[in-house]
Swiss-Prot record:
Binding positions for 5-amino-6-(D-ribitylamino)uracil per the UniProt entry: F22, A57, Y58, E59, T81, V82, I83, F114
Organism whose genome encodes this protein: Mannheimia succiniciproducens (strain KCTC 0769BP / MBEL55E)
Role this protein plays: Catalyzes the formation of 6,7-dimethyl-8-ribityllumazine by condensation of 5-amino-6-(D-ribitylamino)uracil with 3,4-dihydroxy-2-butanone 4-phosphate. This is the penultimate step in the biosynthesis of riboflavin.
Record-level GO cellular component terms: cytosol; riboflavin synthase complex
Molecular-function annotations in GO: 6,7-dimethyl-8-ribityllumazine synthase activity
Keywords: Riboflavin biosynthesis, Transferase
Identification of the protein by name: 6,7-dimethyl-8-ribityllumazine synthase
Length: 156
């Protein structure tokens, strides 16, 4: 039986990291985790990483789409934080970001890793940005690299 599974090292991969500025006190930690994982575990060169900042999580899909359409990147990591408030705004933003990012990956055939935190409160977001629950930015970066390597195997 042949088993295909992507590894994490991708030293020649070109990766875009797209991050929302809104909730930057959390998102900055996600970026640090993602970039650290790309460089340290994935062995991606600094010059092959592009950081793109957008206003908020709702704007992530459009920027991700443009980056995917440019054909300059082997993978894209989308990072942000949406914290539930007292209105339905959470559902619109979280759903729009999630659906939009997912569509880009499927339509462009470029791996887009979803590293957008959708939490009930600030404490949960902080936990997932590098404290109790690990760093979801780092996890998303590793997913992106694994998919780059897996797709290369599938196409070989």
């Amino acid at each position: 039986m042949k088993v295909l599974e992507g590894g994490l090292a991708a030293p020649n991969a070109k990766v875009a990291v797209v991050v929302a500025r809104f909730n930057s006190f959390i998102n900055d930690s996600l970026v640090e985790g993602a970039v650290d994982a790309l460089k340290r575990i994935g062995q991606v060169k600094d010059e092959n990483i592009t950081l793109v900042r957008v206003p908020g999580a709702y704007e992530l899909p459009l920027a991700v789409r443009r980056l995917a359409d440019s054909k300059k990147y082997d993978a894209i990591v989308a990072l942000g934080t949406v914290i539930r408030g007292g209105t339905a705004h959470f559902e619109y933003v979280a759903g729009g970001a999630s659906n939009g990012i997912g569509h880009v990956s499927l339509e462009s055939n470029v791996p887009v890793a979803f590293g957008v935190l959708t939490t009930e409160n600030i404490e949960q977001a902080i936990d997932r940005a590098g404290t109790k629950s690990g760093n979801k930015g780092a996890e998303a970066a590793l997913v992106a690299l694994e998919m780059v390597n897996l797709l290369a195997q599938i196409n070989a």
